[in-house]
Swiss-Prot record:
One of its GO terms (cellular component) is cytosol. It catalyses: orotidine 5'-phosphate + H(+) = UMP + CO2. It is an enzyme of class 4 (lyase). NCBIfam families: PRK00230.1, pyrF. CDD domains: OMP_decarboxylase_like (cd04725). The keyword Lyase applies. Catalyzes the decarboxylation of orotidine 5'-monophosphate (OMP) to uridine 5'-monophosphate (UMP). Its EC number is 4.1.1.23. Substrate binds at residues 17, 39, 66-75, 121, 182, 191, 211-212. Homodimer. InterPro entries: Aldolase_TIM, OMPdecase, OMPdecase_AS, OMPdecase_bac, OMPdeCOase_dom, RibuloseP-bd_barrel. This is Orotidine 5'-phosphate decarboxylase.
Length: 235
């Protein structure tokens, strides 16, 4: 479960939220050696993007497969077993006990790390109430984090607003991956619980997931390099 301190460049994970493999490859070419870690989520994965994972790994990059698996234990386990062959560094599952246990058991000794998603960064207390939860965001995130730690997942995905609190619970070595990262002056978009890169690192995040501020920048490579520089200064 230990998480080594990654190089500054590899603490930035760029979300390849594009509709095609060709668009992803074009962005990867633009970013060059400024980015060493990419996230593939639903949009790209369902457009054939999982085939990019071994290609990126062969090119010396790391990949975060963000599928947020959640199903009965056997189904999750079989899915995880299939995904281990791709060579990804991270895979997400939702932080439900049965789902987490199945994923941890199925990944075996593959080296792929299981990250549990606590509460989506687009949710706030009102959203949880609408969904029927009795707990607010902070309490639900903490409860799920403690369950994940007991089950043996390798890391958590949480809002940067919860990073400092969770780092105190899980200790210094477990991965803590935070989306909802917006450099100063960037629009929040559909994220409700956001933070700048420097503040998120200072709060205890091990990795930052950044999409639109890089992908939609006039100069994506320059935008990525600026975030990496901010990460380095915040340590």
């Amino acid at each position: 479960m230990a998480q080594a301190d990654p190089a500054d460049r590899d603490r930035l994970i760029v979300a390849l939220d594009v509709p095609s493999v060709d668009a992803a490859k074009a962005m990867i070419d633009k970013l060059g050696d400024s980015v060493g870690f990419y996230k593939i989520g639903y949009q790209l994965a369902y457009a054939g993007g999982l085939a990019l994972v071994p290609q990126l790994v062969d090119a010396g990059k790391k990949v975060f497969v963000d599928l947020k698996l959640h199903d009965i234990g056997n189904t999750v386990a079989r899915g995880v077993e299939s995904l281990t062959a791709l060579g990804a560094t991270f895979l997400t599952v939702h932080a439900y006990p049965q789902t987490m246990r199945a994923a941890v058991e199925a990944r075996g000794t593959s080296g792929m790390k299981i990250l549990a998603v606590t509460v989506l960064t687009s949710y706030d207390d009102a959203d949880l109430t609408d969904a029927g939860y009795a707990l607010g965001v902070r309490d639900l995130v903490e409860a799920r984090a403690r369950q994940a730690l007991a089950i043996g997942v390798d890391g958590l995905v949480c809002s940067p607003e919860e990073a400092a609190h969770l780092r105190g619970i899980i200790g210094p070595r477990m991965a803590l991956v935070t989306p909802g990262i917006r450099p100063a002056g960037s629009a929040a978009g559909d994220q409700k619980r956001i933070m700048t890169p420097a503040r998120a690192i200072a709060a205890g995040a091990s990795h930052l997931v950044v999409g639109r501020p890089v992908m939609e920048a006039a100069d994506p490579k320059q935008a990525a390099e600026a975030i990496v520089a901010e990460i380095a200064q915040a340590k």
